[in-house]
């Protein structure tokens, strides 16, 4: 089940250069780190990764997993395979959400999409991390999952009314291994990224969607089940 409709408006994310020789430390300068993140993603054409998405809030705890594909400019595809199949994708202009076996598919222009995942598509573009996340800073009070990683915090532009903070965990080689979105209602969504592969060949057809025959197309800005 996709959680809270707007879970993509995250804006850019955090990393170091691939060839950074020194491990990240709590003393890392935020401005320098943000610049390295921007440079890293500016040179990335595609990204493929396994992901785990965990939601907790309102007495609900839910974990899903699947494969994420991203391609410049602004295209991404989330293929959920556990606990049941479903697909979210965007070609940079239109976003689609479809659960196989259902009689309808949801569609909306990307510019109208109200979901916290959507800004992830800007990772493979000319992004400026410090401009995308208000109050970007180190989060020494939040322990990273893996030794050597650094955790940053900030609030996505224009989302302070619903987002308490967004946490970004960065690995020593400059990859984002985790994103945590903590909302003002007390709920939290965590994305973990594994087996990340950069600049692999991803066909454009992966970001196109044709509704199966007999499927109703429903317009809307929120993608929930």
Predicted regions and their residues:
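Gly/Pro-enriched, hydrophobic low-complexity segments
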Residues: 28, 131-221
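Flexible, surface-exposed loop/linker segments and immediately adjacent secondary-structure boundaries
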Residues: 103-148
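Bacterial N-terminal signal peptides that target proteins for export
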Residues: 2-12
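Envelope-exposed proteins and targeting segments
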Residues: 45-47, 64-66, 72-74, 84-86, ...
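N-terminal leader/targeting segments and the immediate start of mature chains
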Residues: 2, 24-62, 211-225
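An acidic-aromatic
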Residues: 67-119, 189
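Bacterial N-terminal signal peptides
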Residues: 11-21
